[in-house]
Swiss-Prot record:
Gene: rplL
Function as written in the Swiss-Prot or TrEMBL entry: Forms part of the ribosomal stalk which helps the ribosome interact with GTP-bound translation factors. Is thus essential for accurate translation.
Subunit: Homodimer. Part of the ribosomal stalk of the 50S ribosomal subunit. Forms a multimeric L10(L12)X complex, where L10 forms an elongated spine to which 2 to 4 L12 dimers bind in a sequential fashion. Binds GTP-bound translation factors.
GO terms for MF: mRNA binding; structural constituent of ribosome
Pfam hit, one: Ribosomal_L12
Cross-referenced Gene3D superfamilies: 3.30.1390.10, Single helix bin
Lineage, broadest ranks: Bacteria, Pseudomonadati, Spirochaetota, Spirochaetia, Spirochaetales
Name assigned to this protein: Large ribosomal subunit protein bL12
Length: 124
């Protein structure tokens, strides 16, 4: 049975965060692309002059957990609502997006929380 776009979207709606993260990672590895590049290209195509517009959505990227792996895992669990195993896998897979599509103020607040427990974080 061939899957169509609607089948995939229906599955994504019911999928857990880690299932989606695993899917994105598998797509990145299989096709040699990154989600960040694909999003940037799509935005540039849909907007005539992307350079002149100010960015309104930001992603919080965990670059590394530093010396406080356990505290970072706890904070990631609190932020994302993931289970212990899922949060641990996400932290250990750094650099990885913790949250995407946030306002600038929310992204900066999240960055401060993660840095307070020893993580190295970027907002893109």
């Amino acid at each position: 049975m061939a899957l169509n776009k609607e089948d995939i979207l229906t599955w994504l709606e019911g999928a857990k965060t880690m299932e989606v993260v695993d899917l994105v990672t598998a797509i990145e590895e299989k096709f040699g692309v990154t989600a960040a590049v694909a999003a940037g290209v799509g935005g540039a195509v849909s907007v005539g002059s992307a350079d002149s517009e100010e960015q309104t959505e930001f992603d919080v990227i965990l670059m590394s957990f530093g010396d406080s792996k356990i505290n970072v895992i706890k904070e990631v669990r609190a932020i994302t609502g993931l289970g212990l195993g899922e949060a641990k896998a996400l932290v250990e897979a750094a650099p990885k997006a913790i949250k995407e599509g946030l306002s600038k103020s929310d992204a900066e607040e999240l960055k401060k929380k993660l840095e307070a427990v020893g993580a190295k974080v970027e907002v893109k």
